[in-house]
């Protein structure tokens, strides 16, 4: 049985490991003795049905204070990773597909007809190739028709942008997408209700606004705290990434947190600022295998997460993380003066 001292030590260790863990996480509130907050997290859908050897030492306490209401069909694996690929890039079929099949990994491919999709088949997939990805068991997600950023000015066009991709999927025998990725990782509060009405269960954003967009850094998805239509990316791969950057993103998985990873082309000639070298991508996937990660598509989160249980304030966890990270950065700057 963990003492309070042991509980505090293990919780701090978990925060140090991931580097960006939220102070408002269910585990932290349990450690602080804030049982009311723990119950709120559980009601929102936090999965505490974790293996009994959970290193945070908080599982028993969570269950004691209302965790007997299981919110998902299956226990969450210790290292749960979601792979996502944006923009219908040709290399998704020619390079990514065989690598994922070799490792037997799941993944979501978010398709759009934006950019030069209709005329440039050197850099973008055909719908026949997208259909083949579906036939292989991968998820086809919605990334809007024109890769339209979701802003105040474009909200009115969002239903048709999403419905167009849904119709195209239907025409090629692909199920209507239930997962969505925000083009350009641009989010807007009023999009949540709209996405729900369009049948979207899970929506992935980037690592911003917690982190700047430029370096692709992000945070893990915390079910019950993060809204299922505002799922953050733990990492958004960039051409200057190293294996260490990828490992840092993956290491955030655990203790009830999920590492959702964002890729574009492998390679990506039309968007070189989000390009991933194939050789490095191969190393990334090997690392996931060596770490014995459970690697799934975004839709398959429904096996572990109840998408109908929502936090009271969708953006509260985002603001909390921003405040914590800002404080940490200020402390670092003060120590270097």
Question: Which ranges hold each PLM region?
Answer:
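Ankyrin repeat structural motif
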Residues: 34-43
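Ankyrin-repeat boundary/"N-cap" motif
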Residues: 22-28, 42, 51-58
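Bacterial N-terminal signal peptides
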Residues: 9-18
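Leucine-rich solenoid repeat scaffolds
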Residues: 58-65
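C-terminal domain-boundary segment and adjacent tail
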Residues: 67-70, 117, 170-172, 202-214, ...
């Amino acid at each position: 049985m963990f003492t309070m001292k042991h509980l505090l030590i293990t919780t701090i260790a978990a925060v140090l490991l991931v580097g960006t863990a939220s102070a408002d996480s269910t585990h932290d509130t349990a450690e602080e003795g804030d049982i009311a907050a723990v119950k709120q997290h559980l009601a929102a859908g936090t999965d505490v049905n974790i293996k009994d050897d959970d290193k945070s030492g908080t599982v028993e306490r969570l269950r004691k204070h209302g965790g007997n209401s299981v919110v998902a069909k299956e226990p969450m694996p210790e290292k749960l990773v979601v792979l996502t690929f944006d923009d219908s890039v040709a290399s998704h079929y020619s390079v990514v597909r065989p690598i994922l099949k070799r490792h037997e990994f799941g993944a979501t491919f978010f398709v759009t007809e934006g950019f030069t999709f209709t005329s440039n088949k050197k850099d973008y997939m055909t719908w026949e190739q997208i259909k083949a990805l579906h036939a292989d068991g991968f998820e086809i997600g919605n990334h809007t028709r024109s890769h339209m950023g979701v802003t105040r000015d474009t909200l009115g066009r969002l239903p048709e942008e999403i419905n167009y991709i849904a119709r195209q999927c239907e025409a090629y025998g692909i199920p209507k997408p239930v997962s969505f990725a925000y083009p350009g990782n641009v989010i807007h509060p009023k999009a949540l209700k709209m996405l729900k009405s369009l049948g979207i269960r899970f929506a992935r954003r980037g690592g911003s606004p917690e982190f700047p967009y430029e370096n692709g850094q992000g945070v893990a998805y915390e079910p019950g705290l993060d809204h299922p239509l505002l799922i953050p990316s733990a990492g958004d791969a960039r051409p200057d990434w190293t294996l260490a950057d990828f490992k840092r993103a993956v290491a955030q998985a655990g203790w009830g947190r999920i590492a959702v990873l964002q890729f574009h082309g492998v390679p990506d000639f039309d968007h070189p600022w989000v390009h991933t070298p194939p050789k490095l991508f191969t190393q990334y996937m090997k690392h996931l295998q060596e770490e014995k990660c459970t690697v799934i598509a975004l839709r398959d989160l429904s096996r572990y997460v109840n998408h109908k249980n929502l936090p009271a304030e969708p953006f509260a966890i985002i603001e909390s993380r921003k405040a914590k990270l800002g404080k940490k950065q200020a402390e670092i700057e003060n120590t270097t003066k």
